[in-house]
Regions:
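C-terminal helical subdomain
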Residues: 185, 204-259
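Rossmann-fold cofactor-recognition segment
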Residues: 51-69
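Catalytic loop of short-chain dehydrogenase/reductase
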Residues: 99-100, 132, 136-177, 188-191, ...
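Substrate-binding pocket helix/loop in short-chain dehydrogenase/reductase
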Residues: 100-108
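Conserved NAD(P)H cofactor-binding loop of Rossmann-fold oxidoreductase domains
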Residues: 93-98
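Canonical Rossmann dinucleotide-binding motif of NAD(H)/NADP(H)-dependent dehydrogenases/reductases
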Residues: 2-35
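Hydrophobic positions on the long internal alpha-helix
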Residues: 76, 91, 118-122, 126, ...
Length: 270
């Protein structure tokens, strides 16, 4: 089992929703410091103030950062590393679900392009074979990555499927043996968050689809999602995938993901 005690963490999209809940759970578990990266300065300063009051001023730091601007993202990494000497954990949580014609490219930029840049920077700084001391990267995918969704949030689903594939690939045992950096994917079910509240689509029926989906899968709280993420951190192997839905404990679904890849690749090398 892996411990969070005395670890230094970065959480992107940490100003509200699931990200803020993760920050709180990490602090309750005894992390040394959490850097909150978010573009929302008002919410970021607010959560920083709340957490500092409860856990101490040195335990948390808000850094205004648009993760799609690589210079800002890398500067946040360097600032955290220079202040604490190292980074142990990165949670790539920043994301949106907006598929309106003028927004779908930003959904891709935030959900996958920026997440990839953050993942690679974390890997560069942590990897043991390049002078680091190992660590853990947790990438937030979604239950949408496991489904063929109706054409309402299919771009969002595609970005989350890409996140899942990236994380599973980087987490392969043969690669982890060299880097000592775990990569873990978390697939959340419907969760009350800004993404949930601000769902956007080119399809005008999005609200009707949302209502149907909620009946099938009642939304869980961000706090439940964060508890599931901590469980995955403590017990997950590199390359593992965890499902957190319906307000139930986190489930390791790695064997199912691996089986799916086996089926899909059956005839490739014949």
């Amino acid at each position: 089992m892996f411990s969070l005690k005395d670890k230094v963490a970065i959480v992107t999209g940490g100003a509200c929703g699931i990200g803020a809940a993760v920050v709180k759970e990490f602090l309750q578990e005894g992390v040394k410091h959490v850097a909150i990266l978010d573009v929302d300065e008002e919410s970021g300063r607010s959560i920083e103030k709340q957490m500092a009051a409860n856990f101490g001023n040195d335990k948390v730091k808000f850094i205004k950062c648009d993760v799609t601007i690589e210079e800002e993202l890398l500067a946040a990494y360097e600032k955290t590393s220079s202040n604490y000497g190292y980074i142990d954990i990165v949670v790539n949580n920043a994301g949106i679900a907006d598929e309106r014609p003028d927004m779908f490219k930003r959904t891709i930029d935030i959900n996958f392009t920026a997440l990839s840049a953050s993942t690679l920077k974390a890997l560069e700084m942590m990897r043991e074979d390049k002078g680091g001391h190992g660590g853990t990267i947790i990438n937030i995918s979604s239950i949408a990555a496991l489904l063929l969704v109706a054409p309402t949030i299919f771009i969002y689903a595609a970005t989350k499927a890409a996140v899942l594939h990236l994380t599973c690939s980087l987490g392969k045992e043969s690669y982890f043996a060299n880097t000592k950096v775990r990569t873990i994917a978390i697939c959340f079910g419907c969760t009350i968050s800004d993404i949930y509240k601000r769902l956007g689509s080119f399809d005008e029926n999005i609200e009707k689809v949302k209502e149907i989906f909620i009946k099938i899968m009642p939304p869980q709280t961000a706090e439940v999602a964060a508890i599931g993420l901590v469980e995955a951190y403590k017990n997950g192997q590199s390359g593992s995938t965890w499902l957190v839905k319906n307000s139930k404990p986190a489930i390791d679904i790695t064997s199912k993901i691996n089986k799916a890849y086996e089926i899909l690749s059956e005839n490739i090398f014949e």
